[in-house]
């Protein structure tokens, strides 16, 4: 009863922090000058992380097993993983746009956990015999940590694609508008307003420099986080193979979850290969990461909707 009450309190606190965090996050997106609000959002994510940690420990204490047996618990751990990734650049005091991605991921995932799932899904369950193993913590935690890192890195790549394509569309529209103007009109305007032209050119140059710096930063962080996630995913798949051999007598069975996990691993292996090829631009790598982002969600949610295969232990279970 004490554990249930404590979990209930922590759930409500985390929901309140998430609600406040979403409000502050939306405000800071439109008003960049309010530094105090941004700091409050950062502290809200840390508070949410502490609540999630308390929730995981509480469920572990009264269930008797590591809380990774259903969708609710796996999403809790996913939110916790997002918060961990978020706090690395935060405590290093580096101004990085990776925090925007990780904080929003933490807030919205935890919002889904606390308000988007039915109460029946939030109940702790007795482990089925196949899950009663010490490999549960190793395998599933590595998989979810890998998913979290890969999702964050992929979202940074998506942001890179948005900025790049917006720039390309803007250049195309400017060229189209320039062709509509007559050469004589442009020449007269340049002669009459040379100072304005210089100021405009200087402003455009500084804006392009800032955009290039932002793209470079997003590309660098995306590569680092995806590399980390790929390591976690590899460890998770290998540990799962060892566990499968102990439980089912075979290292690999090609059921839907295993197949899509392998597809996910292959997609991000291709991403890392493109990073080593100097002929590939960052945009090409970002497109591969975007495809990987879609595949992760198919593997995480879509396969479980089928309810078939060796990894199916009921509706919406992760592993």
From Swiss-Prot:
The keyword Transmembrane helix applies. Pfam families: Cytochrom_C_asm. It is found in: Plastid, Chloroplast thylakoid membrane. Its main location: plastid. InterPro entries: Cyt_c_assembly (IPR002541), Cyt_c_biogenesis_CcsA (IPR017562), Cyt_c_biogenesis_CcsA/CcmC (IPR045062). It comes from the Eukaryota. The chain crosses the membrane at residues 9-29, 44-64, 71-91, 143-163, 225-245, 259-273, 286-306. It is a multi-pass membrane protein. One of its GO terms (cellular component) is chloroplast thylakoid membrane. The keyword Lipid biosynthesis does not apply. GO terms for molecular function: heme binding. GO terms for biological process: cytochrome complex assembly. Keywords: Chloroplast, Cytochrome c-type biogenesis, Membrane, Plastid, Thylakoid, Transmembrane, Transmembrane helix. PANTHER family: CYTOCHROME B_B6 PROTEIN-RELATED, HEME EXPORTER PROTEIN C. Belongs to the CcmF/CycK/Ccl1/NrfE/CcsA family. HAMAP family: CytC_CcsA (MF_01391). May interact with Ccs1. Required during biogenesis of c-type cytochromes (cytochrome c6 and cytochrome f) at the step of heme attachment. This is Cytochrome c biogenesis protein CcsA.
